Amino acid sequence: MVLSRKRARHVIEEIIALFPDAKPSLDFRNHFELLVAVMLSAQTTDAAVNKATPGLFAAFPTPQAMSVATESEIASHISRLGLYRNKAKFLKKCAQQLLDDFDGQVPQTREELESLAGVGRKTANVVMSVGFGIPAFAVDTHVERICKHHDVVKKSATPLEVEKRVMDILPPEEWLAAHQAMIYFGRAICHPKNPECDHYPQLYDFSNV
């Protein structure tokens, strides 16, 4: 049974309280590197991405440099990541689009970001919120699993439904903190198998809600 808005907000804010200092775990120094790192993180751990990106960014530090590289050259730096051939293809095309459509700059709106090759709603939301400080809520596998496990949404909810529900429950200034905290919570506590959430009864203490 899906929780009420007040109870769902309580659960999420207790998760934020467990990880108040949660920060992005991808390494990046600018908007282009953030965009590339998030694109690479699909079906791959952030730790694996962070091992690959120093060499990738040293070789191709700008959209211009990446656009003139071959797919094979790009792929050689990310070959240990999942779906690396497809990712190399998307990175090259995305870099060219940045040059052609956005003067080599990473755009800030969801519509413009999603016009780029290999960029879906989750990636756009991460770039907007982490890179530009624009309120957005990204739903990855951790966030979706946690929201379903704790009845914030129904078990059949789509990622978009999860996103809209959390954005309805929380004020915009808490969206990024919730996203980051849920990732840490998912890695450390709310595992796909054998979740340890019961060790944190404060999540379910609705006496003051």
Feature annotation, model-predicted:
Residues 2-209:
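Catalytic cores of DNA base-excision repair glycosylases
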